[in-house]
């Protein structure tokens, strides 16, 4: 959340310049995962300067705030973000709230027979092929790589109900993350105790604030229609829905 990742082993790059870089990453606490954040903060990441970049995200259901941070890191590196493709969990938010942890702890994507499988569906995985074919076509024809690459291809899908929840959740993660960093400086045991308390708080937050914000947004939707449309267009850039 605070973009202070643990260090990674120095990656070995085969070239000094690339025509295109695809950055695939997962979302941790509404932020880019620590490994990819560590790379983007390394000296090796300077190779992205003036280079077209495509981001590829696989996550449960929330990715907007993570991509905002990714955009800022790429901008700081003078990279050129030309596309973003996102695939999310095949089940709804409430089902995945159960199936995702079950998958993590058991290794079984469908731990509960009465719930959908966790993770991205096979159909969505197959759907990635048409983005690959489009990219191959552009490269083979020596066309210029720009933001039109994946436009009008359904590269991302913005869930209006989650936009407010993401902002609230990210604010919570930021505040608690700052508190946990301070607690760790006092005592690892103290930090662990506060962390356990936060886990309980987080579960309560998900079960209360997320549905409440969705209800509030639905009630206010007629009044916020234009604002929501602008936000959707912004978050969908550069590929669009």
Regions found by a protein language model. Give the residues of each.
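FMN-binding flavodoxin-like domain, especially the glycine-rich phosphate-binding loop
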Residues: 3-7, 11-25, 29-241
């Amino acid at each position: 959340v605070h973009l202070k990742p643990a260090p990674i082993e120095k990656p070995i790059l085969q070239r000094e310049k690339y025509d295109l870089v695809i950055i695939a990453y997962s979302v941790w606490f509404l932020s880019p995962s620590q490994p990819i954040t560590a790379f983007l903060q390394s000296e090796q990441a300077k190779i992205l300067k003036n280079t077209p970049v495509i981001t590829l995200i696989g996550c449960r259901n929330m990715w907007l705030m993570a991509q905002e941070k990714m955009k800022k890191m790429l901008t700081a590196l003078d990279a050129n973000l030309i596309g973003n493709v996102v695939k999310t969990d095949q089940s709804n938010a409430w089902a995945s709230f159960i199936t995702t942890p079950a998958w993590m702890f058991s290794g079984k994507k469908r731990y509960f027979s009465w719930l959908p499988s966790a993770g991205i569906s096979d159909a969505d995985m197959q759907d990635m092929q048409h983005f690959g074919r489009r990219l191959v076509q552009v490269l083979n024809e020596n066309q210029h790589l720009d933001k039109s690459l994946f436009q009008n291809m359904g590269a991302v899908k913005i869930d209006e109900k989650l936009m407010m929840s993401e902002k609230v959740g990210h604010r919570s993660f930021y505040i608690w993350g700052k508190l946990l960093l301070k607690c760790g400086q006092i005592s690892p045991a103290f930090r662990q105790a506060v962390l356990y308390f936060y886990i309980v708080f987080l579960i309560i937050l998900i079960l209360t604030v997320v549905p409440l914000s969705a209800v509030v947004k639905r009630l206010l939707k007629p009044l916020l229609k234009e604002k929501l449309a602008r936000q959707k267009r912004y978050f969908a850039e550069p590929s669009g829905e």
